[in-house]
Amino acid sequence: MVIIRLSRKGSKNKPFYQIVASDNRKPRDGKFIEKLGFFNPISIEKSKKIFIKTDRINLWMSKGAKLSDRVKNLLHKYKK
């Protein structure tokens, strides 16, 4: 099953996350199908903090992909 989740990048004490569509059997930071955006929790500017390709996420969800809890919360905040 395809799941849309966060993949951690960045370095120690400076996290940066990519929002990716991947197979749920793959590791968190492993191979993914498509990059759908990013989340930078440290950034102060809103434009550099989060970016989500909502059209692509909607496409994956129509194909049966599930959202992780964290991505679901980020998507809700991004739409506001």
UniProtKB/Swiss-Prot annotation:
GO cellular component, as recorded: cytoplasm; small ribosomal subunit
Keywords on record: Ribonucleoprotein, Ribosomal protein
GO biological process entries: translation
Pfam families reported for this sequence: Ribosomal_S16
Keyword Ribonucleoprotein: yes
InterPro entries, alphabetized: Ribosomal_bS16, Ribosomal_bS16_dom_sf
Domain of life: Bacteria
Molecular-function annotations in GO: structural constituent of ribosome
Similarity field: Belongs to the bacterial ribosomal protein bS16 family.
Protein name according to UniProt: Small ribosomal subunit protein bS16
Species assigned in the record: Wigglesworthia glossinidia brevipalpis
